[in-house]
Amino acid sequence: MPGEGGTLPAVEYPYFPDRQHAFVWRNWTLVPAARLAEVLATSEENVNRLAASMGLRPQRGIEPYWSDARGYITVLRRNWHLLPYDQLLTLLGLTREELAWRLIEDDFLFVKLGNVKPACEPLRYRAPDERAMRGAARIDSLLGTFGREAFAREEPRFSFIEEFRRPRP
């Protein structure tokens, strides 16, 4: 895999209580909870609890295009600094060969990701400690301040494609 075994430290997300909370937050509207649980080697119930602790609404149907050739780049970018390659493969549902090809051949994606794969330790579920629970409650409180509906209303991804397909008067 390109850049495998790199030593560049991954970007940290200090506004999240820990990496597992960041992982759930960044993927909640893109990847089904069952797949997130598989990546974290835990139950779907634990993933749902992490999400709820940050004030995220229960998942609605996740569009399948996030794992196809149109959407996987978004998922990959959101997790490049969170997960090692093996867990990215699980998250994306790709083989090593498929991901290697996409990184090198698909629009020079590896170059756009910085020409390096940051060093990421495997991410496994751990029951949140008191500090993590306080951090998640702070995020929940912030969502309450701004109004939860502001974050729940999303225009469907790639909806602009349908707009382009409509005949113009």
Task: Describe every region a protein language model picked out.
Residues 1-169:
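Mature N-terminal, pre-catalytic/accessory segment of carbohydrate-active enzymes
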